[in-house]
Amino acid sequence: MKVVILSFTQAGTRLGERIGSQFRNEGITCQNYAPAGYAFADILPFPDNPKELIREGWGETSFLFIGAVGIAVR
C-alpha cells in the first residue's frame, strides 16, 4: 500500500506529518506534500504539476487531502 498526503495549510501540514509518521511506523509507504513555505524534513513541496502526481497514482495509491473545511465545501 502507498499513501500520498497533500496538505494545504500550516496546521494541515502538521497534522499530515503526524498521520504520515504513523503510516510509516506501520510499514506503509507514505509521502507528504505541502506548499513550499510549509515543506520541511519529510514534507516535500508540491510538485510542479500535482494533477499529474494524482493521475499517475490513481487506482494504486491512497490519497489523503488535508485542507480547510471552507475550501473543501465550496
Please identify what each model-predicted range represents.
Residues 53-74:
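Glycine/small-residue-rich interface belts in oligomeric ring/scaffold proteins
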